[in-house]
């Protein structure tokens, strides 16, 4: 594949030399800022994705009314019924989640990359997964509330369980009073595998693709197009691999709980996986695939591009 672009005289792609590390708090802050910036633009697609993934929960295809039939139609339905603000439901919780999760994830990965821990495909995958697991665990309460708020709407277009929170703060207080501290981390057993897989794919693909594009000399070595192309490739890879994990995570987070503070529909990741496949077929794991791709591809592209550019701009001022 390389020869189609580089010819026989092009240098063999290999890992780029590690960048000098930024001050860790700055690195974490830049990761958070980059992903929060991307989140503002892609949150309406996250709302639509959540609704599509909850539609027809544990019901066979054709046995339920499809209120949402695709990305554009779903955006229209939400905008018409809930107003323009409805397209940004859960934005505050989404920004908190992106700031916590991706600040930790990208910041810790950058520190491992600077230390040379990520050299080699397997090492970058493991480092990306570890960074993702850390970020997902810490930020899980924010994702829980985000899912509840984005699923919440008027009865005419409601899908999934409706939690009827008044906002992010009241949701956190309500969940804590009803279920305790553990309730704030309900669904984390679906979030950690989801982000581990997505993070490993995103960071390893982005790093490898950028090295390959730079070494095959598609563009000048300092061109931002190297970063942009690598980010697009990373976004496509993440969208394909992450969708089943995303569906399971959404279901675990949004399910109601019983008087024993246990989920009424699923008791864990594997149970959810088996029940979805049994009731909805394997394709049930790919519900919302289009909005996942439409959201994740630009979100990954924007966040990876912003993160890389911000780090490049910050580097001269920290050394």
From Swiss-Prot:
Segments of skewed composition (Pro residues): 10-22
Cellular compartment(s): Mitochondrion inner membrane
Domain of life per record: Eukaryota
Keyword terms: Membrane, Mitochondrion, Mitochondrion inner membrane, Repeat, Transmembrane, Transmembrane helix, Transport
Region (Disordered): 1-22
Main subcellular location of this protein, as a coarse class: mitochondrion
Membrane topology: Multi-pass membrane protein
Protein name stated in the entry: Solute carrier family 25 member 34
Taxonomic classification: Eukaryota, Metazoa, Chordata, Craniata, Vertebrata
Annotated Gene3D superfamilies: Mitochondrial carrier domain
Similarity field: Belongs to the mitochondrial carrier (TC 2.A.29) family.
Annotated transmembrane regions: 25-45, 63-83, 116-138, 188-209, 224-244, 296-319
InterPro entries reported for this sequence: Mito_Carrier_Antiporter, Mitochondrial_sb/sol_carrier, Mt_carrier_dom_sf
Annotated Gene Ontology cellular component terms: mitochondrial inner membrane
Record Pfam families: Mito_carr (PF00153)
Solcar repeats: 22-115, 119-212, 222-313
């Amino acid at each position: 594949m390389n020869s189609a672009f580089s010819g026989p005289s092009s240098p063999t792609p290999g890992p780029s030399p590690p960048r000098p590390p930024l001050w860790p708090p700055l690195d974490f802050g830049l990761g958070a800022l980059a992903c929060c910036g991307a989140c503002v633009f892609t949150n309406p697609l996250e709302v639509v994705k959540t609704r599509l993934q909850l539609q027809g929960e544990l019901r066979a295809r054709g046995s339920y009314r499809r209120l949402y039939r695709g990305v554009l139609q779903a955006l229209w339905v939400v905008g018409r019924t809930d107003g323009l603000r409805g397209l940004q439901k859960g934005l505050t919780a989404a920004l908190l989640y992106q700031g916590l999760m991706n600040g930790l994830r990208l910041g810790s990965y950058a520190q491992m990359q600077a230390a040379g821990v990520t050299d080699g495909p397997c090492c970058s995958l493991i480092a990306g997964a570890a960074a993702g697991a850390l970020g997902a665990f810490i930020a899980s309460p924010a994702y829980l509330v985000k899912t509840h708020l984005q699923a919440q709407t008027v009865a005419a277009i409601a899908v999934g369980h409706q939690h009827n929170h008044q906002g992010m703060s009241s949701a956190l207080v309500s969940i804590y009073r009803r279920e305790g501290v553990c309730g704030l981390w309900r669904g984390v057993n679906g979030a950690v595998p989801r982000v581990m897989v997505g993070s490993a794919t995103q960071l390893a693909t982005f790093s490898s693709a950028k090295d390959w594009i730079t070494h095959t000399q598609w563009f000048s070595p300092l061109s931002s197009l190297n970063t942009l192309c690598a980010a697009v490739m990373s976004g496509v890879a993440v969208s394909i691999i992450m969708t089943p994990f995303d569906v399971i995570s959404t279901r675990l987070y949004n399910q109601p709980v019983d008087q024993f503070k246990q989920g009424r529909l699923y008791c864990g990741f594997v149970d959810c996986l088996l029940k979805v496949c049994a009731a909805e077929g394997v394709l049930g794991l790919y519900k919302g695939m289009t909005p996942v791709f439409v959201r994740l591809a630009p979100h990954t592209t924007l966040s990876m591009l912003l993160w890389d550019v911000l780090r490049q701009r910050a580097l001269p001022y920290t050394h």
